[in-house]
Amino acid sequence: MIKTLSLLISCFILAIAAGLSQAQEAPPASLAAPEAAAKATPADGHVIHVTAPHLIDGKVRGPFHHYCKIVSPEPFIECLLYETEDNNAKLIGVEYIVAKTVTRDEKVLPRKAWKKVWHDHSVEGVIGNVKVLDMPPDKAKEFADTVAKTDGIIFSLWPEGAKLPTGKVSIGTMVGHAVHQ
């Protein structure tokens, strides 16, 4: 009887210890879905939502969801690119949108480099592939008019169909962009 009771107590203690061990190994819920940070971060402010297809490695892909923020008034805009608008969508690229007064300055960016990897957003707007979402029409037009005075460069970080990034970064461009000679 004492042996049976000792065995039951031992099993009970082992079960509790195993449960505590598992609980300690599981990531805290606060890491999986952190509360809003009190301190502002560089990731804050990507709230301008735009969709547009891209030409990546010779293939039309998308449309991609761009979540953009205006970093400085020249303008300098950065966009985080996703395949979907799901809140758990993976980041698949980045687009930098920069005023033509900066990108067309030979002292800042050699013309040969601009011609190869940058695209003109005034052309992209005319083609009609870009849609500004989640804002009133007058604000969407104001944003589109601002972007029309810029050039863009797209870094595609996640190859199509890959389960993980491979380390290969492709330079995407707008659909309809021709590499200038």
Q: What are these model-derived regions, one by one?
A:
Residues S21-A23:
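Boundary at the C-terminal end of the N-terminal hydrophobic targeting segment
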